[in-house]
């Protein structure tokens, strides 16, 4: 895969430039654009993934299905599709917006900061998974209610962005409705 960049943003969310993805994620990460997606299978189960140990931020942590960064000139929806193919080897239905104004800042145990405007999407898988081990070290298909209960009971076991997304009542309601609509 070619070198990825992040789109830097000002405080109002207006693009101000780009920076190479790995150079962008430091202890002083600038605000940038990202996306987060929750994928469901035909049974309505959520794909929960465990980040590869080689990941710069939050290695080995359980998280929602796939996250990434749109490239310059690429829509968020196209970025979701691209990363699903790259990380999971899977085709998906058109991504649907779940939490369009999600924004967060979090610091992982090594000091790496995520500082993102990060719209959240949901989609369904339409093919079998072909996991990229450089991105994902493990995965599970789970009932959404069980995952949400797990997040509520043990938030430390999941990525901070997944916990924050699940804490939003409107996003939680939309994810539940999406999971039930087969």
From Swiss-Prot:
Its EC number is 5.3.3.2. Pathway: Isoprenoid biosynthesis; dimethylallyl diphosphate biosynthesis; dimethylallyl diphosphate from isopentenyl diphosphate: step 1/1. Its cofactor is Mg(2+); Mn(2+). The active site is at residues 67, 116. GO terms for cellular component: cytoplasm. Binds 1 Mg(2+) ion per subunit. The magnesium ion binds only when substrate is bound. Binds 1 Mn(2+) ion per subunit. It comes from the Bacteria. Keywords: Cytoplasm, Isomerase, Isoprene biosynthesis, Magnesium, Manganese, Metal-binding. Mn(2+) binds at residues 25, 32, 69, 114, 116. One of its GO terms (biological process) is isoprenoid biosynthetic process. Pfam families: NUDIX. Catalyzes the 1,3-allylic rearrangement of the homoallylic substrate isopentenyl (IPP) to its highly electrophilic allylic isomer, dimethylallyl diphosphate (DMAPP). This is Isopentenyl-diphosphate Delta-isomerase. It comes from Escherichia coli (strain ATCC 8739 / DSM 1576 / NBRC 3972 / NCIMB 8545 / WDCM 00012 / Crooks).
